[in-house]
Amino acid sequence: CACFLESAVHETHACNYLLADDIDMEPVPGYAAASWKRGYGDFVFKPDLSTMRLVPWLEGTALVLCDVQDHHHQDLPHSPRGILKRQIARLTERGYKGMFASELEFYLFDQSYESIRAQHYREPRTANYHIEDYGILQTIRDEPVLRAIRKHLQAAGIAVENSKGEWGPGQEEINVRYADALTMADSHSIIKHACKEIALLQGKAITFMAKWNYNLAGSSSHIHNSLWSLKGNKPLFFDAKAEFGMSKLMRQWVAGQLKYAGDITYFLAPYINSYKRFQAGTFAPTRAVWSNDNRTAGFRLCGEGGKGIRIECRIGGADLNPYLAFA
């Protein structure tokens, strides 16, 4: 619109409590960056115009993602997108380009958000009645919502590869083509909002909680990651002469993730509910080990012996922040 082009295309401002609140948008005390003592002033939203796109599921609507800056136009040190950008810069200095893909699982409910809230979130009705994993008949029941999600995301410039039923009643997964770390994190964020908004428009509801029901499969966000040349044309994890096709660099990369698995889990499982997902016999990992094509390990080798070789971190739940998780 004209107002955006006149001013907001350069920047706009918002209350700085937005990076110091809880999941219910309540301000949380104890932060140096934003508090009642400091008066909850503004920070700057600087649009990243490379992320601008139409929002096909909403008439006359466009979307642009922003970097969060202070009044001197310096990135805030605690901005998740800024944290990832700094990590990417460090990786670039070493001559590497990180490529990522995140699988997103969620539960679809055959109720609206309002009706679920009215029943105090107790026993919401899932869109299906038994395990959907790779099932054809079951996922047809969910297709009106899933088709809309795939179609609209594709129209919004996100390269959807597929959706599929998962290991719970009404549980689905959406997969998109891998990309550089920042593009993938941006896409991940847009996908989650799109899924919830499209479901709302159809009178349905979606949750990305890691474990909304103790007796059902949790929802994960598996992160596929690999290193490439800066031009993105040479996979640096592949060595045709090495065991499994794993280059020395890849082995070092995996070793680092294993060594710090406990520390990075803070960003992969950020909430109390996140840890309820870690149950044996549910396809959620319970050991910080790596293995070749083994879905019970925290880190799974995929694409053995080929240029698509990568490591899949299976620790993360669907509730993770993609910017912090990728960083």
What are the functions of these language-model segments?
Residues 64-70, 172-179, 225, 313:
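Short, hydrophobic beta-strand segments
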Residues 69-75, 138, 178-184, 231-232, ...:
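A generic structural motif
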Residues 99-107, 119-136, 156-176, 206-226, ...:
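Core alpha/beta catalytic barrel or barrel-like domain that forms the active/cofactor pocket
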Residues 117-126, 221-231, 288-290, 297-303:
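Short beta-strand elements
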Residues 121-146, 181-192, 196, 230-240:
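Acidic, His- and aromatic-enriched active-site or binding-groove loops in soluble protein domains
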Residues 137-142, 146-160, 174-181, 192-208:
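Accessory "access/gating" subregions that flank catalytic or transport cores
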